[in-house]
Regions:
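Hydrophobic alpha-helical transmembrane segments
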Residues: 47-58
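Short helix-coil transition/hinge motifs at the ends and kinks of transmembrane helices
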Residues: 45-49, 105-106
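Juxtamembrane "helix exit" motif at the C-terminal ends of alpha-helical transmembrane segments
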Residues: 31-47
Length: 171
């Protein structure tokens, strides 16, 4: 359970940073366009001081925004959280595989204990590497898992990818 939750939270945090990056770029482009327009207006009409003042204010805002967002490398933050989400997903799948092998009886008790220890060590290592997330990412993950059932796959969805003879719900 924890692996699935942590995976989804990391995924949602990566989405947040992606959206922040997109909005930041749009704002930067918009302000750059306004600054350029103001400079062109000054060149065309050198006598109007309003263009000069407005352009100076926009340029100052642009500089402030650029300096502020230089502190945040949203692309790198997004990448880090995506990579961590994948690590948690792989760990969850490894636990699922262990449970399947236990149910199938293909592992001895010693093998189960050894694999469980290995997975626990991986869990500890990944936990140490996992970056902190926001409360918003947690809430979006909660909605995705509890309400939207993001991690639940129906038999119908599984059957789509199987050959006809392996499907549970044959047509």
């Amino acid at each position: 359970g924890r692996c699935g939750w942590t995976h989804k939270i990391q995924e949602k945090q990566a989405d947040t940073y992606h959206n922040n990056r997109v909005w930041t770029e749009c704002i930067r482009i918009g302000i750059s366009a306004l600054t350029t327009s103001g400079i062109l207006a000054i060149v065309i009409d050198e006598q109007t001081s309003v263009f000069k003042i407005v352009t100076a204010i926009i340029a100052l805002i642009s500089t402030g925004i650029n300096l502020y967002f230089q502190k945040f490398d949203f692309q790198s933050l997004e990448k880090i959280h995506k990579e961590n989400a994948v690590k948690w997903l792989v760990l969850r799948e490894d636990y699922t595989a262990l449970i399947s092998e236990m149910r199938a009886g293909v592992l001895s008790d010693e093998e189960v204990i050894e694999q469980k220890r290995t997975l626990l060590e991986q869990y500890k290592l990944i936990s140490k590497e996992t970056p902190i997330t926001t409360n918003g990412a947690y809430k979006r993950a909660e909605k995705a898992l509890k309400i939207n059932m993001d991690d639940i796959i129906s038999q119908e969805e599984i059957d789509i990818f199987l050959p006809q003879e392996l499907r549970r719900e044959r047509e």
